[in-house]
Design a protein with these regions (language model features):
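Active-site-adjacent "lid/gating" segments in soluble enzymes
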Residues: 1-100, 108
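Histidine- and/or cysteine-centered catalytic micro-motif in compact active-site loops
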Residues: 51, 101-103, 168-171
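Short, solvent-exposed polar/charged micro-motifs at secondary-structure junctions
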Residues: 56-60, 129-137, 175-180
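Aromatic-enriched alpha-helical interface/lid elements that frame and gate functional surfaces
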Residues: 84-161, 165
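A glycine-rich dinucleotide-binding beta-alpha-beta segment and adjacent secondary-structure elements
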Residues: 160-181
């Protein structure tokens, strides 16, 4: 709860994170034991705890807090240290999720996705720290540009620009996904 939600309202995770982490480490332990048995002919025992598993998964917030001397802020669907990052509404009402992780992606977003090279040199957005300081204005500009496109068109542009992205689906849309049927 201390890292999820917004500054005003914490939020629980959508699933049992500690249980999922522990299951992942158990699966890895079984694979390691099978590999060891294949190589040496000997079995092996291992232990996994919920606490140890979630401790590993909490390493980023822990290292950030230790290194920065302050905890990560709860940022909702935003990222604590990257902008732009999160869900953005397109002109057809669909929601697209993406995050800019480096300078190449920032330039590609401005030029290839938004079609506005002036944003790349705008002093408010030139570096990631500046984009973080002016995040509200940047997100507004992005959604204004996206208003001219459907979610599918935005996704195509992001894909062509090699920017990690996803369409934000409802549970109903997920259940209709062709890979499920």
């Amino acid at each position: 709860l201390s890292i999820n939600g917004t500054e005003d309202q914490p939020a629980k995770c959508g699933l049992a994170v500690a249980d999922t982490a522990t299951g992942m480490y158990i699966a890895n332990g079984v694979l390691m034991a099978l590999f060891n048995r294949e190589r040496t002919g000997n079995g092996m025992a291992f232990e996994v705890s919920l606490f140890d598993s979630i401790t590993e998964w909490m390493s980023y917030p822990a290292y950030y807090t230790e290194g920065a001397g302050k905890p990560l802020r709860r940022t909702g669907t935003r990222h604590a240290t990257i902008a732009p990052y999160g869900p953005f509404r397109a002109g057809d009402g669909g929601v697209v999720f993406f995050g800019i992780q480096n300078e190449r992606e920032w330039l590609a977003l401005c030029e290839e996705v938004l079609g506005d090279t002036s944003l790349a040199s705008d002093p408010r957005f030139h570096t990631n720290p500046q984009r973080m300081q002016n995040r509200d204005a940047l997100e507004t500009l992005i959604e204004q540009k996206f208003a001219n496109f459907s979610a599918d068109e935005v996704l195509e542009r992001l894909e062509a620009a090699s920017i990690a992205n996803a369409h934000m689906n409802t549970v109903e849309a997920f259940l209709k996904h062709p890979q499920i049927h």
